UniProtKB/Swiss-Prot annotation:
<dbReference type="InterPro" id="IPR035642">
    <property type="entry name" value="MraZ_N"/>
</dbReference>
<dbReference type="InterPro" id="IPR035644">
    <property type="entry name" value="MraZ_C"/>
</dbReference>
<dbReference type="GO" id="GO:0003700">
    <property type="term" value="F:DNA-binding transcription factor activity"/>
</dbReference>
<keyword id="KW-0677">Repeat</keyword>
<protein>
    <recommendedName>
        <fullName>Transcriptional regulator MraZ</fullName>
    </recommendedName>
</protein>
<dbReference type="Pfam" id="PF02381">
    <property type="entry name" value="MraZ"/>
</dbReference>
<dbReference type="GO" id="GO:0009295">
    <property type="term" value="C:nucleoid"/>
</dbReference>
<keyword id="KW-0963">Cytoplasm</keyword>
<dbReference type="GO" id="GO:2000143">
    <property type="term" value="P:negative regulation of DNA-templated transcription initiation"/>
</dbReference>
<comment type="subunit">
    <text>Forms oligomers.</text>
</comment>
<dbReference type="InterPro" id="IPR007159">
    <property type="entry name" value="SpoVT-AbrB_dom"/>
</dbReference>
<dbReference type="InterPro" id="IPR037914">
    <property type="entry name" value="SpoVT-AbrB_sf"/>
</dbReference>
<dbReference type="InterPro" id="IPR003444">
    <property type="entry name" value="MraZ"/>
</dbReference>
<feature type="domain" description="SpoVT-AbrB 1">
    <location>
        <begin position="5"/>
        <end position="47"/>
    </location>
</feature>
<dbReference type="GO" id="GO:0005737">
    <property type="term" value="C:cytoplasm"/>
</dbReference>
<dbReference type="InterPro" id="IPR038619">
    <property type="entry name" value="MraZ_sf"/>
</dbReference>
<dbReference type="GO" id="GO:0000976">
    <property type="term" value="F:transcription cis-regulatory region binding"/>
</dbReference>
Amino acid sequence: MFMGEYRHNVDEKGRMIIPAKFREELGETFVVTRGLDRCLFVYPQVEWKKLEESLKNLPFTKKDARAFTRFFFSGATECELDKQGRVNIASPLREFAQLKKECVVIGVSNRVEIWSKELWEEYFAESEESFSEIAENIVDFDL
């Protein structure tokens, strides 16, 4: 399981360090794709396969299903870490997530998310205020 928040930098070649605590669970190869809220989603292969199976079952006759799967899969790229524990993030993905220099890497259960520092701080500030309300609306168990 992925959890925690880490701050890292993207270098001029588009490489960034993946936190050591995430490396083993990500495995030798993993998938990076466009996520929701202008961040990147990073999945270990086993989780990616589960997600792929679920998304294949969406009705392709529905316009929204086609749009979502196109968006999600067209941005996906298989990646691996170099010897220094860095991943090279493709330019279109960096542009999508507005990754320039500083970024935030967070663990979210079965995936990792990569955010620009600015977008993460903005998202967190907005979400922090409504966290209790969000939890009340979606969570059906005691925290």
